[in-house]
UniProtKB/Swiss-Prot annotation:
It comes from the Eukaryota. Disulfide bonds: none annotated. NCBIfam families: rplT_bact (TIGR01032). It comes from Cuscuta reflexa. The keyword Glycosyltransferase does not apply. This is Large ribosomal subunit protein bL20c. The lineage of its organism: Eukaryota, Viridiplantae, Streptophyta, Embryophyta, Tracheophyta.
Length: 118
């Protein structure tokens, strides 16, 4: 059997990886073997950090809510507010509540008073 030269196919694959790694620094954007290694590593980090980002934002929303609640003296703490929201079947998630708390804290005060009256 004759040897098959796969220059064009391999070049196309390397060119695709080179384009992906064009923003990397040093040899990570020039040498083929390190390009593939760093490309895999970058994709793994991106996958991991997408999940981490969700956790970080949830923590941020909870921290903001707790700070506003304690500052205004609405409730004793965040967990009691969330418990009463769920018991009264109010469908406001943490993201919306934290946006309300930052932009218009009086609205959050009205929501908490409504919960207390029920």
């Amino acid at each position: 059997m004759t040897r098959i030269k796969r220059g064009s196919i391999a070049r196309r694959r390397r060119k695709k990886m080179c384009f992906f790694a064009s923003s990397f620094r040093g040899a990570h954007s020039r040498l083929t073997r390190t390009i593939t290694q760093q490309g895999i590593r970058a994709l793994v980090s991106a996958d991991r950090d997408r999940d981490r980002q969700k956790r970080d934002f949830r923590r941020l929303w909870i921290t903001r809510l707790n700070a506003v609640i304690r500052e205004m003296g609405i409730y004793y703490n965040y967990s009691k507010l969330i418990r009463d929201l769920y018991n009264n079947q109010l469908l406001l998630n943490r993201k919306i509540l934290s946006q309300i708390a930052i932009s218009n804290s009086k609205c959050l005060y009205m929501i908490s008073n409504g919960i207390l009256q029920i």
